[in-house]
Amino acid sequence: MTQLRFALAQIDTCVGALDANAAKVLDYSRKAAAGNAQVVVFPEMTLTGYPIEDLALRRTFRQAAWDKANELATQLNDDVLGDLFV
């Protein structure tokens, strides 16, 4: 039977800091891959920070978060770290 190796990433994010939070996701993903993890699980709202409250009402922030998620997915793929599933 094939086994699947998971890594759980409990990281401290900052509300609204999309670039910094994405960098942490990349860093933890690299560390997990180095430890032979096949799946890395992050807490909800890792990219946007929690709670986003009023930021969620701003169309520009929602678009920026979407764009950053796509950029992060591309970077993960380029680094052969897999895909980003939300």
Q: Predicted segment positions?
A:
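Hydrophobic structural segments
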Residues: 1-86
